[in-house]
Amino acid sequence: LEHLAPGGIFCQWLPLHQLEVGDLEAIVSTFTAVFPHVQLWVAYHRSLTPLAALVGSASPIAADADAMRARLRDPTFLAMARGVGMDDPDDLGVLYVTDGDRLRPVVRDVPWITDDRPRIEFSAPRGYFHQEGLGRDALAWVAARLDPAPAPIAGARPATFEARANLLRAQLALLAGDGPAELRAYLDALAAAPASPAARAALAAIAAERRRAGDVSTADGITRVLGSPVRASE
C-alpha cells in the first residue's frame, strides 16, 4: 500500500478458470485486509476462461463514464479500447460487481496469504489437473456477490446496470455447456437494457454460430430481436 502514489490504484487480475473457490476467498480476504478501498470487477464476454479483477487504493476509487467518452474521441485510445471490446463506457458499467464493504464480511474468517504461508503457491497448481467446474464455481462465487445497486460510475446510463445479473447468468450457462440457457439469459439482459453493448455483441455472436451450424431459424430469430424492441424470455 505504501508503494502507491497518491490516488494510485493496484489491480490484481484473477483467472477464475484456474482458481478453486477457497483460493479465491483467500485472495479476496488478503486484498481487502490490505486496501481500505476495494472494488471487484468481472469480465464476461462469452469466455471459457473467465476473469475478474480486484482494484484497491488508499483513497476512494472513482470511475467516470463521461471522461471515458471524451477519451474515446482519441483515435489511438479508441483503437486500444476496441481491441479489448470496451469501446462504449457502458461496457465498463456492466462489469462492476461490488465493493470491499460487501466483500469483507464474506471472507472475514478466511486466513490471509502471507510470505510464510503462501497458500496459492501450493494449491493453485492443483487446479491445472482438476479443472472440471473450476471456472464455473469461482464465477458463481463472484456472481453471488453482485451488488444490486448501480455501479459507482459517474455519467453512466443506469439502465445498463440492470443487465448485469443476466450477463453473469449467461456466462455461467456457457461454462455449463447449456446453450439454450445462455441464449435466454442474453435475451433477458437485452430486455433489461436494450442498448447493452455486451448483450448485443453476445447475441450477434450466437446468431453467427447458429447460422454456421445450420440452425438458420434460430439465427434469424436472434437477428430479428436485435433489430426490434425486446421482451424478457419466458
Model-identified regions with their sequence ranges:
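Structural register within alpha-helical repeat arrays
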Residues: R169, L203-I206
